[in-house]
Amino acid sequence: MPLPIVAIVGQPNVGKSTLFNRIINERVAIVEDRPGVTRDRNYARASWMGHQFSIIDTGGITWEDSTIDEEIRAQAEIAIEEADVIVMLADASQGVTSLDERIAHLLYRADKPVLLAVNKADNPEQRTDIYDFYSLGLGDPIPVSGSHGTGIGDLLDEVVKNFSPDAEKTEEGVISFSVIGRPNVGKSSIVNRLLGEERVIVANEEGTTRDAIDTPFVKDGTKFRVVDTAGIRRRGKVYEKTEKYSVMRAMSAMERSDVAILVLDASTGIREQDKHVAGYAHEAGLGMIIAVNKWDLPKKDSSSGKDFEAVIREEFSYLDYAPIVFVSAKTGKNIDQLPKMVKEVYENKNQRIQSSVLNDLLLEASRLVPAPMVKGKRLRVYYMTQVKTNPPTFVVFCNDPELMHFSYQRFLINQLRENFDFTGTPIKILPRKRK
């Protein structure tokens, strides 16, 4: 099961981003920031009272005619579709506005839990004024102050009450993967070809809140679940072509995935949108496979394949761990290799290395390349241990974490890759001061 998703929506300038940031700072723990549309820092994974969830901050909803306003509204509507719980934020100092009423009517149609939070209720008089917001028909208004932090705990208590009891459970023994990429690269065709070639189709399951089709199947005795981002219903060609729309669709799929297959179009080459989606998947810590589709076209031979692979390695240098496979959804070329590759990446991503073996490697690495001097002070590395899998994460204890330059972390990652099979998975190094 995917993590529950909470969307914060409302008109402009009611304090949505302030509330979002306050939740991140005030809750018990932030699991990790999620990039993507996230250069705007509007997507994070969080927890409250033991409940993990993803939270989305959206732009202010208006019904102006400008292209920017239309795109912002489209993004908010996508977030509403994705969400399990919606928080509508209003402004106590403004009172109930016509925009609030229009947004409330939009949320009536969502057919999912909606909580009404009234921001800037900073004093008793403003808290009394919130009763006007009952007119929106969204239940009891919850007074909050994003700037001061009051009422945030009460709001989050109500949020987690609305999570499905099964929302945070995971299905054992099933490898979930998503097929991601910009529009029209052949994602849906690859999924259809993949499923059409399987001997056993277990069942089709439609996501109850997301309109994305998760399809379980069995291949060579292994249970898989493919998340087809193309199954999310479209909102029209103008939004289908926007970069953020594509990333939002990919984000939803990645929340339900162990591994992502990034599909590139051999006929059009690499676009900026490809890099945006790939960057999100990489920073989210997913296992990665790069599938170059439409390799059935003329003039696609082994020589041009090597050339294209070189371009991929240059453009996606941060994905140097991801295997590349040339496929054709039209002819079926190499499609049957994808489940096998997904399984291998999943296993690599979840392997655990004994500390004694790691420290032997660390000792040998120190002999090969002595720890560097930084500002006249030498880095001293003492020992390494693996603290988690999925993705593999290693803590390296040293005399001063600030002395461990990125280049030395990269060296240690390369040593790990040379000695163990981490194909397809990112590796994280966390320097820590030895106590």
From Swiss-Prot:
Binding positions (GTP 1): 10-17, 57-61, 119-122
Gene: der
Subunit structure as annotated in this protein's UniProt entry: Associates with the 50S ribosomal subunit.
Keyword entries, A-Z: GTP-binding, Nucleotide-binding, Repeat, Ribosome biogenesis
Family: Belongs to the TRAFAC class TrmE-Era-EngA-EngB-Septin-like GTPase superfamily. EngA (Der) GTPase family.
Protein known as: GTPase Der
GO MF terms held by the record: GTP binding; ribosome binding
Residues the record lists as binding GTP 2: 181-188, 228-232, 293-296
Organism name: Lactobacillus delbrueckii subsp. bulgaricus (strain ATCC 11842 / DSM 20081 / BCRC 10696 / JCM 1002 / NBRC 13953 / NCIMB 11778 / NCTC 12712 / WDCM 00102 / Lb 14)
